[in-house]
Amino acid sequence: MPLPSRASSTPKISKACVPCRTRKIKCNAAVVGLPCGSCVSRECPDECVLSARKRRTVKGRNAEVPRSRKNIPDTNGSILSPRQQQLPTNVSRQTTDSSHSDPVEESIHASHTGSSLRNDTPHSRDRRPPGQAQADLLYLNILQDTVNDTSAAQTDASDHQSNDEPDDSFNSQIHHWNPPPQLDDVDNEYLAKKKVFELPPPRFMDDIVKAYFDYVHPFAPILNRIDFIQSYRSGSCCIFLLHAVAAAASLYVTHDVLIGCGYPDRSTAQASFFSKAKLFHDFHCQGDPLSMLQGSMILGAIILDHPSDRDFQYWFHNSVRRASKMGVQNACLRDDGSQKLYRRIWWVLHNRDIFHFFINTQNMRLLANAPPIRPLTEADWETEDIEQWSGILSPISQAQKVSLIAQCELAQIFGNVMSVVTSSNPSAEEIHKRILPLDAWRTSLPERMHLMASFAEGEIYHLEALTTSYRFECIMCRLLRRGRWQMSDGGLREWAQQRFRSAIFELDTIVKRVMINNMIQKLPTTFITTITALLALHIESALDAAESSLIRSMARISVQHTMLALDQIRDTPAIKRALPAFEIVLSKNKLYPMSTSDTEQINTMQTMSQDQALSDGHILQPPQTDMTLPQDDQSFLYGDFIGFDFLDRWQMEQLDFTGIY
């Protein structure tokens, strides 16, 4: 059956598109127009363009480029997304639009989806080389390799000649045999009713974007800030990515912004944005591959106030899948303008891969066999001119760059430690050797981040990095002293016990310092989840009969301080979800006064904790409680507090928020 032709709507094309020329494969753009069948089959139609020197606009591609925001009508003060403008018509790739995009918008859109045409094409950076096709089935993979190997020998002249031949491209044939799913009118109507294609009013959306770049992006710089702002302003930004950004930033915007967006609190706002992004993803409303990857990575760092099957583990796996499919690890090796962005993306994924495995060794390392790339440096950030966007973007500081670099180094240190402790015959000497660089790493941070003596904004990145390091040291030492890896060396367990207590003390100090400087609400989710893990460790120590009375008393005092910290961020969805579970545990064991009448007692314990001891040398003793628990409740003492297994034993819903690093 003859294939549908789009040539009638396009001018005569006498050469292959840029991606096909780069890959040295046949291009049927002369027959079907742009995007060609090869680019469509690889799900990268936005990358299908002619060489930049042609300087002409192909009408067939105009239907793929969203209109500028200035042409988008305002509905109840909300911005309509580019996709919503096409409703209720079908959104298949064959649908044409009579409107034409401004060439400037096309260049901005192309820049956001990969890079400008002045450098190598996004396809040449993001995609695997011709021997590594992306077919899902083995036989298709083999056939594609055969076709690509044959086509690779062709010259540009043969490419030019093949453009006038009938469409016999293997990739195009695969696309027509197995077309991607399309949304029908019912799907479009459902998504429209869910307001998936709508964004908050522009003035509030600007506040959300600014909050994202101020409080979220510095710890995971997976966006090219200038490209994102340009595509956002032009209205061509992927709606999935925008909803993901809004979900992450909803923790940091003011209450007035939440009200202006139509949400009464942070939990409702975050859940709404998260749900819209999830629907966009589940209905296969595909944006460009890079935006889908970035959005998945952002959603992978979000914890809702209720359980979800699409938790951070799901989005992390999805991010790795998309990154591998795009060939991000190969793009990191190229020397072009987009290399910096892809290197940062790959290192963020690499860090998460190690930390997810470190938290729970039952998790599989997804990137363990990935080819190594050179370490991240300060040169891996773009040189930006943000004067035009100064109302949204702030300059990137030295501390922000060093923060991610330090996280990468930390991941390498703990990755080396885990390779030893999980080996068949780990030795104490080897563990000591692998953990030794951690102390030097911590000592070097203040100088590398150019910190001042007084508490400044840059101190946030320093404290966040230290918090992550002490948290994972607690995890490792706690498991070592509990014999998790069958370590029979008594000296090693004593060493692990000492380092565990020192790390707990440092975490307590950091939390208090952040509270005193009123900075706790500006810290990322990774810091917030560390506070919950810290509280669980204090509860464990307070209820551990094997601990001395001194340790148990100090743990009880620390519980009060940690609960005060959580109270400062109780409107955060992750904490809102955790507090009821903690309150049940604490109330059941009389570790925390739950009534307002006990406020004075809390303040007294805070004052006494500063001096550590009374004037007569005795440690402050909490009210006597019956430490004998029912048999059903004793079992949680032997569970993993970091994973909150003890809550499962009380038939509480599983809380996965400590799993996020």
Swiss-Prot record:
GO terms for molecular function: DNA binding; DNA-binding transcription factor activity, RNA polymerase II-specific; zinc ion binding. It is found in: Nucleus. GO terms for biological process: DNA-templated transcription. Keywords: DNA-binding, Metal-binding, Nucleus, Transcription, Transcription regulation, Zinc. Residues 73-98, 110-119 have a biased composition (Polar residues). It comes from the Eukaryota. Fusaric acid is phytotoxic to plants such as cotton and banana. It has been shown to induce programmed cell death in plants. In addition to a mild toxicity to animals, fusaric acid exhibits acanthamoebicidal, antioomycete, and antimycobacterial activities. The keyword DNA-binding applies. Pfam families: Fungal_trans, Zn_clus. Transcription factor that is involved in the formation of the two Fusaric acid derivatives, dehydrofusaric acid and fusarinolic acid, serving as a detoxification mechanism. This is Fusaric acid cluster transcription factor FUB12. It comes from Gibberella fujikuroi (strain CBS 195.34 / IMI 58289 / NRRL A-6831) (Bakanae and foot rot disease fungus). The lineage of its organism: Eukaryota, Fungi, Dikarya, Ascomycota, Pezizomycotina.
